[in-house]
Amino acid sequence: MQWQDHGMIVSMTPYGDTRSILSVFTRNHGICNAMIRLNKKKQSLQIGDRVCVTWRARLANNLGYFNSCEIISSAFYAYFQDHSKLLCLSSVTSTIYKSVPTNDAHPILYDYLIEFAEAAECGGHWYNEYLKLELEILSQLGFALDLSRCAVYHCEDNLLYISPKTGRAISERAGVSYRHLLFPLPQILRDLHNGTHTEQCSRKEFLLCLQILGYFLHRHLLSDDSKFLEQRKEMTALIYEEEAF
């Protein structure tokens, strides 16, 4: 069996001196784990690289080999000067690798990942694309937030809170007495969820959204991953310091 697809490297595990097990999140085949023989060119492969791979194996459920792995865009050149971008890239590739089932195609999620990567690599604003990507991870894996209307009164106005239990929006009227138990609902997060926002969010908004989405990602998908919360704290601390500077 053989196929070719575009993807992003989400994990690399050394296997002896001349080989590695490479995990690539591809558009049409999901996460594929395969052996790759390393040479001087392939030794430069890194997590976050966008690649075109050719996979081959005797049977579909075999580990297989990547016969070719051509770099389309190198993560090193795009991210090495921006630590906050690099941490976000590292976080989202790790999240996808640990939460998306192997060989389970998610082309829409892949497209969101590439939109974030392209925005980050071009040097422009990328906060919105990153938040949309994390929202889509939750949605694609069955834990979508519902920020379109109040969970209690079903109204669409004055939505000020998010329930940490249900991931649903709560209106001011329904949540005022319990606001100390709820997340604030940033307008930017609601707009991105509903597909109605075009302006880029501020660093302050981005930090709040990272806190909220990080909570739901950890609760639903990464509860056994102690490193996720540590990495999220490092991300928010760095972005906060950049804002203060």
Swiss-Prot record:
A Gene Ontology BP annotation from the UniProt entry: DNA recombination
Family according to the record: Belongs to the RecO family.
Keywords: DNA damage, DNA recombination, DNA repair
Short name of one Pfam family: RecO_C
Organism: Anaplasma phagocytophilum (strain HZ)
Matches recorded under InterPro entries: ARFGAP/RecO, DNA_rep/recomb_RecO_N, NA-bd_OB-fold, RecO, RecO_C
Protein name according to UniProt: DNA repair protein RecO
Gene3D superfamilies linked to this entry: Nucleic acid-binding proteins (2.40.50.140), Recombination protein O, C-terminal domain (1.20.1440.120)
Function of the protein: Involved in DNA repair and RecF pathway recombination.
UniProt keyword Membrane, yes or no: no
